């Protein structure tokens, strides 16, 4: 705003009169906020629908927080001098450092966890990246990892975090589940999956002691055992759910969807898991299903040497082998029915337990290259009918009253002879 003043003297008689003229100019105030136009940051409220990641400055233990929907990224706030072990190829970012000089404080190394036992038990990953710093820092971990393979696996994975306080152990049955863990007193080990149930469970359920657990596979014969105190980040296929079983409560679950469960020691799986097969036909009575093998022929010959007793013994042996053959066929039929309806994949879990259930199982396939296309349309070699060149001769016939008629002929000689004969 500017102002100007102009004075004018007017003399009236002996009186002087002063007249003033004032001009005022008004300009519109700027509507924008004046500031540094070269700034590289903006206000937090200008960024919508994105979770703000804040680094932890004062921590005693690591903090795990799953992000996203599905939860495919894990944010970790790490205290100083506490190592973090993560699967190689899963690290997305390191942030929360005060200045560029603090990056030098982060130390990285490779740690191998029982590679021979993991190879024998069918557990894939044995190498983990170890990160440690003398100052607090934060990490972003992906649920997937970069690894060369001819088999294309599903990338629909999500995180679940577990805090171990030393009172409960965990058995992780999915071999690719352990993605990241930390804790100075946390123990990660491998054990073989039990094939049969314990005698204690067989007496409780009143079933034979040689009943299988349903968890054992020749290509996946081991599981990861977690004990002690620490933080663990597990990944599973699809969404992950928690199921709590009370005392003596039972649950049927597909073993391919069982991510892990709580146990009391590394040998407690045989006390809570048993294979379950759905009944597909009416079972026979126990008395008729048991086949007793007759005495040997040599024993009968020593006791009775008559032809009648020899015939009875031979007939008894024939009945025994015939019944054994029918029993084998019935067992094969039961196994075939169970395989067709998928019963062989179900196991029964007996509480009290905590279960982690993944909504989908691991699938893999060989990725085949797609054919090359030009401009989005596949070019195909299409051959049409071949056209041969030929000479065509035409002549015109003018007939009074009929007009002009055009005709074609391969040879003028035949046409001329025909016209002359007319």
Curated annotation (Swiss-Prot):
Keywords: Mitochondrion, Transit peptide. It comes from the Eukaryota. This is Altered inheritance of mitochondria protein 24, mitochondrial. GO terms for biological process: inner mitochondrial membrane organization. The keyword Mitochondrion applies. The gene is AIM24. Gene3D superfamilies: Mitochondrial biogenesis AIM24. Residues 1-23 form a transit peptide. It is found in: Mitochondrion. The keyword Transit peptide applies. Belongs to the AIM24 family. InterPro entries: AIM24, AIM24_sf. GO terms for cellular component: mitochondrial inner membrane. PANTHER family: ALTERED INHERITANCE OF MITOCHONDRIA PROTEIN 24, MITOCHONDRIAL. It comes from Scheffersomyces stipitis (strain ATCC 58785 / CBS 6054 / NBRC 10063 / NRRL Y-11545) (Yeast).
């Amino acid at each position: 705003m500017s102002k100007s003043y102009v004075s004018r003297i007017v003399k009236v008689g002996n009186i002087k009169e002063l007249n003033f003229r004032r001009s005022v100019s008004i300009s519109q105030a700027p509507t924008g906020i004046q500031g540094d136009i070269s700034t590289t940051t903006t206000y937090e409220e200008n960024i919508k629908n994105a979770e703000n990641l804040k680094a932890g400055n004062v921590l005693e233990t690591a903090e795990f927080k799953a992000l996203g929907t599905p939860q495919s990224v894990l944010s970790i706030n790490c205290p100083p001098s506490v190592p973090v072990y993560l699967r190689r190829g899963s690290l997305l970012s390191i942030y929360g450092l005060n200045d560029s000089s603090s990056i030098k404080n982060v130390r990285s190394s490779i740690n191998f966890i029982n590679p021979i036992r993991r190879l024998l038990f069918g557990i894939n990953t044995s190498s983990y990246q170890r990160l440690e710093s003398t100052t607090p820092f934060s990490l972003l971990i992906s649920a997937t990892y970069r690894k060369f393979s001819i088999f294309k696996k599903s990338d629909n994975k999500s995180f679940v975090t577990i805090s171990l306080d030393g009172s409960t152990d965990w058995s992780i049955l999915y071999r690719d589940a352990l993605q990241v863990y930390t804790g100075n007193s946390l123990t990660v080990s491998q054990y073989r999956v039990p094939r049969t149930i314990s005698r204690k469970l067989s007496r409780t359920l009143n079933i034979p002691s040689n009943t299988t657990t349903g968890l054992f596979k020749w290509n996946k014969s081991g599981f990861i055992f977690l004990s002690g105190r620490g933080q663990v980040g597990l990944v599973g296929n699809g969404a992950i759910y928690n199921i709590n079983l009370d005392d003596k409560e039972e649950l049927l679950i597909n073993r391919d969807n069982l991510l892990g469960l709580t146990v009391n020691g590394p040998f407690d799986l045989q006390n809570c898991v048993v294979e379950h097969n759905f009944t597909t036909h009416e079972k026979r009575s126990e008395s008729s299903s048991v086949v007793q093998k007759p005495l040997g022929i040599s024993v009968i010959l020593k006791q009775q040497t008559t032809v009648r007793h020899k015939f009875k013994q031979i007939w008894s042996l024939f009945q025994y082998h015939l019944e054994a053959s029918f029993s084998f066929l019935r067992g094969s039929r039961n196994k075939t029915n169970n395989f067709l309806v998928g019963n062989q994949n179900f196991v029964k879990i007996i509480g009290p337990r905590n279960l982690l259930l993944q909504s989908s199982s691991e699938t893999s396939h060989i990725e085949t290259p797609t054919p090359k296309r030009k401009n989005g349309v596949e070019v195909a070699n299409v051959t049409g009918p071949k056209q041969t060149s030929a000479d065509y001769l035409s002549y015109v016939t003018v007939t009074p009253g009929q007009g002009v008629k055009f005709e074609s002929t391969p040879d003028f000689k035949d046409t001329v002879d025909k016209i002359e004969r007319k």
